[in-house]
């Protein structure tokens, strides 16, 4: 079962030149006897229904501020998720507790769209019991629109943040690696148009 509730507030200032809206969401989800991937003694993995439960709870705040052709979107998400079995609760892996996002858009209708974005991910628990490192990913996009066609360019992760630059993706030797969880981008900077 689950429950979510959200609240919205919208207003404007300076004779309507500045718009402001905020959305606040709260959520809770509970799964009894969930299906989880578990390692076996022979080094393989198996999907098993556990006898406990998993739950997630948290909140998300989204703010939008507009001024003429500019729009700023700010967001924060808090997620607390864990699995409880035999009276012991453990934090779920690969789920950052804190996530921030920000997007600044400039848009002239039917002419231009330009956007700059940044996303922050807090440290998260990994399958080997260690914590991953925090990281930020940034992007930029631009689109010029004409009557019959448009040109578009997208620069993803232009700061070239890659897990291999700030953390390992395997331990042991290259001939006998033990692979770690992938929790951050591996591709680095990507451009498409």
Question: Where do the language-model regions lie?
Answer:
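Active-site lining segments that contact anionic ligands and/or coordinate catalytic metals
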Residues: 2-4, 19-21, 111, 135-137, ...
């Amino acid at each position: 079962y689950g429950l979510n509730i959200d609240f919205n507030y919208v207003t404007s200032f300076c004779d309507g030149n500045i718009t402001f809206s905020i959305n606040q969401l709260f959520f809770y989800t509970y799964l009894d006897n969930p299906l989880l991937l578990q390692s076996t003694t022979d080094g393989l993995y198996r999907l098993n229904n556990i006898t406990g439960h998993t739950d997630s709870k948290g909140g998300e705040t989204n703010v939008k501020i507009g001024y003429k052709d500019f729009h700023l979107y700010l967001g924060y998400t808090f997620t607390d998720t864990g699995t409880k079995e035999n009276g012991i609760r453990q934090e779920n892996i690969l789920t950052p507790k804190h996530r921030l996002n920000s997007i600044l858009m400039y848009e002239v209708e039917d002419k231009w769209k330009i956007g700059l974005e940044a996303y922050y991910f807090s440290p998260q628990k990994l399958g080997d019991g260690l914590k991953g490192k925090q990281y930020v990913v940034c992007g930029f996009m631009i689109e010029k629109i004409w009557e019959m066609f448009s040109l578009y360019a997208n620069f993803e992760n232009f700061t070239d943040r890659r897990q291999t630059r700030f953390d390992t993706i395997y331990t042991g030797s290259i001939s006998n690696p033990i692979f770690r969880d992938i929790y951050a981008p591996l591709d680095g900077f990507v451009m498409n148009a």
